[in-house]
Amino acid sequence: MIIDTTTVQAINSFSRLKSLNEVYGIIWMLVPILTLVLGITIGILVIVWLEREISAGIQQRIGPEYAGPFGVLQALADGTKLLFKENLFPSRGDTRLFSIGPSIAVISTLLSYSVIPFGYHFVLADLNIGVFLWIAISSIAPIGLLMSGYGSNNKYSFLGGLRAAAQSISYEIPLTLCVLSISLLSNSSSTVDIVEAQSKYGFGGWNLWRQPIGFIIFFISSLAECERLPFDLPEAEEELVAGYQTEYSGIKFGLFYVASYLNLLVSSLFVAVLYLGGWNISIPYISVPEFFDFEINKVGRVFGTTMGILITLVKTYLFLFIPITTRWTLPRLRMDQLLNLGWKFLLPISLGNLLLTTSSQLFSL
């Protein structure tokens, strides 16, 4: 059988074009993910700098000032230092669990950002179960902490891992019930739909005013999830040296450091999305898509998306002042006080709040 030369050339060019299209498709798929990771990295650097400056102001001392203008590059300098430090392994520990633990803590928190809408249609994955996917993913992080504590073969590390697991279980249930109340009010579990449900009445339509009890419980539970003071028992210095982080050094210790700030940022972003109206301007009957005419005007779409991202970030970083100042205001709880607060107070109150929300929705039908 004789094949024409032109046919062979056509087949080769078609296969080459197909492979190029596949490469372009992969690149186009990676662009938003890499953009999100870059944005998160910058966001964490800003949070670390803000916390150090606010903490210095509260304690009436001078914060970081030499690494870059106003000390903005101090976190980057600390990260670079940890990157070049030696990774030490405990001699009798489980090296596999010891190495996997920090990665699970970081990856599970990073995946939570995929369902956060930073602007109108500016979300990596707009899912019908977005908020509950976040809760499911965030519940994986304590497994990594427990693995780190167990793999270290150290009594302080293991006790810190057990505390982290117990604390996470105690406060995830009230947090989930608060999110369920928001879903009932918005008639959706999509993060985009929840933001749009708050846009009609502007500032007065925020879920903060419709769910004040849920907001307080969500805030307390998110502080406990992030292991911020007064809920930092898994790594209490006076009791457990550094908890599950005791045996870590170098980049692995840096991963735990990054994971804690990733968790703090994602919690604040979800507060902005669920309770503070997300990307919307706080003016009644004016939403970002309608104001900038998204459907017709392409320039307005770009400008509106940028404005939505800025509004979301402003709300997030303004809210971040509360957990940062709380760190230097309240004393650490005992373990029994922490568990009593979660099981005996927050859980019944969040159940009552869910019952009230369900009743109001039924009567409004």
From Swiss-Prot:
It is a multi-pass membrane protein. The keyword Protease does not apply. It catalyses: a plastoquinone + NADH + (n+1) H(+)(in) = a plastoquinol + NAD(+) + n H(+)(out); a plastoquinone + NADPH + (n+1) H(+)(in) = a plastoquinol + NADP(+) + n H(+)(out). It is found in: Plastid, Chloroplast thylakoid membrane. InterPro entries: NADH_UbQ_OxRdtase_su1/FPO, NADH_UbQ_OxRdtase_su1_CS. The keyword Phosphoprotein does not apply. NDH is composed of at least 16 different subunits, 5 of which are encoded in the nucleus. HAMAP family: NDH1_NuoH. This is NAD(P)H-quinone oxidoreductase subunit 1, chloroplastic. It comes from Populus alba (White poplar).
